[in-house]
């Protein structure tokens, strides 16, 4: 037994009951009774009519037991160590004064620059020693004659 739902009121319609309304666009509406059909055809809003299921749902009617509010899970902040740094180190860095942190940063930058300069200097020396004897006259490229085609005449293609 297939039980339908009323398109207006939302109540169950048992087989053999209630009118069916088919619109020109092919949409079919089933109603519980003539009262629902006439209300639908006069374009009444079922949410504003007291006896419909939609109204009762909207205004929270007929809920026998008070449903306790769902507890939402809140994100809790939790501090933990990051790979390569323990929690104590992180907290110590955070509690440092900005001047100290700035001085440390500048010192680290200076050390990195010096290391880079030293590396470049050694690289320069090694490249000069290997490049010096292998100095030969560069070959000149011979220009190839370009093939000149006749101008294109005619339509688009």
Swiss-Prot record:
GO terms for cellular component: cytosolic large ribosomal subunit. The keyword Cytoplasm applies. It comes from the Eukaryota. SUPFAM superfamilies: Glucocorticoid receptor-like (DNA-binding domain). Residues 96-157 are annotated as: Disordered. GO terms for biological process: cytoplasmic translation. It is found in: Cytoplasm. Residues 96-117 have a biased composition (Basic and acidic residues). Keywords: Cytoplasm, Ribonucleoprotein, Ribosomal protein. GO terms for molecular function: mRNA binding; structural constituent of ribosome. InterPro entries: L24e/L24_sf, Ribosomal_eL24, Ribosomal_eL24-rel_N, Ribosomal_eL24_CS, TRASH_dom. Pfam families: Ribosomal_L24e. Its main location: cytoplasm. Residues 131-145 have a biased composition (Low complexity). Component of the large ribosomal subunit. The ribosome is a large ribonucleoprotein complex responsible for the synthesis of proteins in the cell. Belongs to the eukaryotic ribosomal protein eL24 family. Component of the large ribosomal subunit. PANTHER family: 60S RIBOSOMAL PROTEIN L24, RIBOSOMAL PROTEIN L24. This is Large ribosomal subunit protein eL24. It comes from Ictalurus punctatus.
